[in-house]
Amino acid sequence: MMLKLVLRAQRGMRAFAGIGATRKLMLAAEASAPSSVAEASSIFAKVGRDIPLKVVPRAERRAARKAAKHSADAATGHKVVRTSSLPARISFALLAGSISGSIVWNFVLDDGIKSRVKETLGATFLGDIYAIIAKKVEETVKPFTDPSRQKLLPDWPIPQVPADTPTVPVLVLDLEDTLVHSEWSRKHGWRHAKRPGVDEFLETLCQYYEIVIFSQNYGAEEIVQKLDPKQCALHILSRDATRYLNGAHVKDLSNLNRDLRQVVILDDDPAAYQLQPENAIPVTPFTNGRDRDDHELKDLIPFLKALASERVPDFRQVIGEFRDEDGVVRDLATKYGARVHQLEMQKEQKKKKGFGGFVRGRLSHHPASPTGGVAASGFSSGPHVLKRWTLLDSSAYVVAPRCIKEKCM
């Protein structure tokens, strides 16, 4: 035991002596600052040979390197020229300011504020300068705000149907939180839950509509392939087909290359159809993938079938009949079902009246007709939309739906 203590004491004394010698050499190096490249090189050689490099403080090593570099510059005649960083900072600030201003102007401010700014600047000498700058900025950001092409859908007839096929209505369906709900977790990654009734919805309405699935995100094709394996949807559009307006990616139906009177869109986000709200049927967002009791899509099937099968001239008129006082369509399927039930009750009452009711109706100068139904929305040709429809009755209309039906059934 005593022997171990003695050996440890000897090792400690040797280490202390080594540190003392190292410190002496470092002090000597500091006292004699290198005045030439040779002296600086000798110091570095001495540090590597006699003084362990790891015990030399970093500040002292940096001072030795600076002294050696200064001596080398003095020996070769090179002069260190200091340049000011102020111009570079000013240029960077101007660039960052212009980019930030463009983003705020095109993606944050609404049209009302923009118009007021234009009027104010137009009344001053800065009006012409503003017009030139605004035009350049608009040309720069246009690829990021406008749809990637003017015609989002090909001309009718599309390649999937015969050339003599008459045009059919267009049903635009939002993907996120309307047909599917997507969520991400660290354990499972991305998972997509189909809304209940989406299969029946697509397979039924593809007989009546040219279905377009419109997503606000990229990569919608992979989701739609799993969602719609029978390819009932004829077109898939992604974010590049949207128009960025008022901070939202808007689905501009005017770029569909179809008659807007025969277009209807289902979406859970009012900002997505802000350019054509009269064509929209709002739906409740599907945000709980575990909810298997949702029946909104299934409830809308009867109305959408009747809307297409009755050859309505303008869908917007019919949808407008279901708007509330604030101009928003709510619970359309419920309201439509109530009107259908009301007309059925009226039909039953007429049957009960018998022959007397028939005679009174013939003698009347103003035959009774149901009021408050979809038929009161301004179109008189064709049967009432609220009647019990017979599927695929009109041979003049169902040529195209049958062609489309063969694709997905």
UniProtKB/Swiss-Prot annotation:
The chain crosses the membrane at residues 90-109. Residues 164-307 form the FCP1 homology domain. Keywords: Membrane, Mitochondrion, Mitochondrion inner membrane, Protein transport, Transit peptide, Translocation, Transmembrane, Transmembrane helix, Transport. One of its GO terms (biological process) is protein transport. It comes from the Eukaryota. Its main location: mitochondrion. Residues 64-89 are mitochondrial matrix. The keyword Manganese does not apply. Belongs to the TIM50 family. This is Mitochondrial import inner membrane translocase subunit TIM50. It comes from Phytophthora infestans (Potato late blight agent). The gene is TIM50.
